[in-house]
């Protein structure tokens, strides 16, 4: 969306949010803006249904993931046709919880008693985002101001470590006073059962008898740059392994595994080794004590186009490979030497994180 269209959209949202008055609602109202169900659904489920009215604004693609919660929440699909409905819901909310960058918030006229809390869709960051993303033309003052308006709408950030706090400060212009060191709701699933038992049960369910290598690369805007690993060649060279390619849903590959129905966290729970690149998933995998090999065939290009941060550049070279042959050789020769690199990113991620988050919401919304 170009700068002029964004400017017009923000103007429309600003006018509507000033015209629309808050609806009178019997119970405190919380609105969730959801792109990633794994970040939002744990909070929805944990909140007491009798205390709150809950509304979810989400994409048409993600709306089906809320079917199990249909009795507990109102769902509004985020389309241009429902813009007025979205703003009406926002205006009556005491708290708005988001998991991503939402352009609407750059024009939304927040009321004085509203708070917006960001639960970012990742446990950490190895690539640049926000205003540090090289794709943002920082010399274009209008473009930068449009981004800032969206970022400045957020009052608080849920974080699991100081490193992610640092990323928010660098990339989004956040301050230390905005950090809520409660941990992240997305990690709650890893504390709800014995991991070894869950891993064995899942492997049995999906018929996996070997060690599982999971390839979860980050998304590249040029779809031609998104690669799957040759499954047949990998498994021929490493007969003790089963490989699953889990590419971005928008990437069409007729010759790779159809695992679209299995969410990434379930695949990670089954995995023995992660293969990734600039994604945040290696950070999340470290919480499960799963090592990662970084298959970074386009490292130089990606760094130039998007940017890789100081945490990526601190990864030891022994964990990086640039070809499939080197990847296979590293697993053959060094597998026993690899260990998770990012355990210190989980200082505040605990089995009590979700409870701390809901306690905070109760305190802020019902006071």
How would you name each of these model-derived features?
Residues 280-346:
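Catalytic binding pocket for nucleotide-activated donors in carbohydrate/polymer assembly enzymes
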Residues 1-85:
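N-terminal pre-catalytic "stem/leader" segment of glycosyltransferase-like enzymes
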Residues 39-50, 170-171, 179-255, 354:
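Conserved catalytic-core segment of nucleotide-activated headgroup transferases in glycan assembly
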Residues 31-33, 88-104:
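Short N-terminal targeting/anchoring amphipathic segment
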Residues 96-97, 155-161, 274-275:
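A short beta-strand/loop micro-motif in the catalytic core of glycosyltransferases
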Residues 349-367:
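C-terminal alpha-helical cap of glycosyltransferases
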Residues 73, 111-188:
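Active-site-proximal region of nucleotide-activated glycan assembly enzymes
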Residues 78-91, 247-283, 287-288, 299:
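Donor nucleotide-activated moiety binding/catalytic core segment of transferases
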């Amino acid at each position: 969306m170009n700068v002029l269209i964004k400017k017009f959209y923000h103007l429309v949202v600003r006018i509507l949010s000033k015209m629309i008055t808050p609806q009178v609602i019997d119970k405190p109202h919380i609105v969730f803006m959801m792109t990633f169900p794994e970040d939002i659904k744990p909070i929805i489920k944990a909140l007491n249904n009798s205390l709150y009215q809950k509304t979810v604004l989400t994409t048409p693609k993600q709306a089906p993931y809320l079917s199990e919660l249909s009795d507990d929440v109102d769902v509004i699909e985020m389309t241009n046709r429902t813009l007025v409905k979205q703003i009406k819901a926002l205006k009556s909310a005491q708290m708005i919880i988001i998991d991503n960058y939402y352009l609407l918030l750059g024009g939304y006229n927040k009321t004085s008693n509203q708070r917006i809390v960001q639960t970012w869709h990742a446990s950490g960051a190895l690539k640049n985002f926000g205003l540090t993303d090289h794709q943002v033309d920082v010399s274009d003052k209008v473009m930068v101001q449009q981004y800032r308006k969206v970022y400045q709408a957020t009052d608080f950030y849920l974080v699991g470590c100081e490193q992610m706090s640092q990323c928010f400060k660098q990339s989004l212009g956040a301050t230390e006073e905005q950090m809520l060191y409660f941990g992240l709701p997305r990690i709650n699933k890893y504390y709800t059962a014995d991991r070894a038992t869950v891993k064995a049960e899942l492997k049995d369910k999906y018929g996996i008898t070997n060690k599982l290598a999971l390839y979860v690369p980050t998304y590249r805007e040029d779809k031609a740059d998104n690669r799957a690993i040759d499954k047949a060649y990998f498994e021929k060279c490493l007969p003790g392994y089963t490989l699953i390619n889990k590419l971005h849903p928008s990437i069409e590959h007729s010759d790779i595994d159809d695992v679209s129905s299995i969410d990434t966290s379930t695949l990670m729970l089954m995995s023995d080794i992660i293969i990734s690149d600039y994604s945040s998933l290696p950070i999340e995998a470290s919480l499960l004590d799963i090592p990662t090999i970084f298959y970074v065939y386009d490292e130089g290009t990606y760094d130039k186009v998007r940017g890789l941060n100081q945490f990526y550049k601190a990864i030891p070279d022994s964990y990086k490979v640039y070809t499939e042959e080197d990847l296979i050789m590293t697993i053959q020769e060094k597998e026993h030497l690899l260990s998770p690199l990012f355990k210190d990113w989980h200082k505040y991620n605990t089995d009590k994180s979700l409870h701390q988050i809901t306690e905070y919401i109760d305190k802020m919304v019902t006071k």
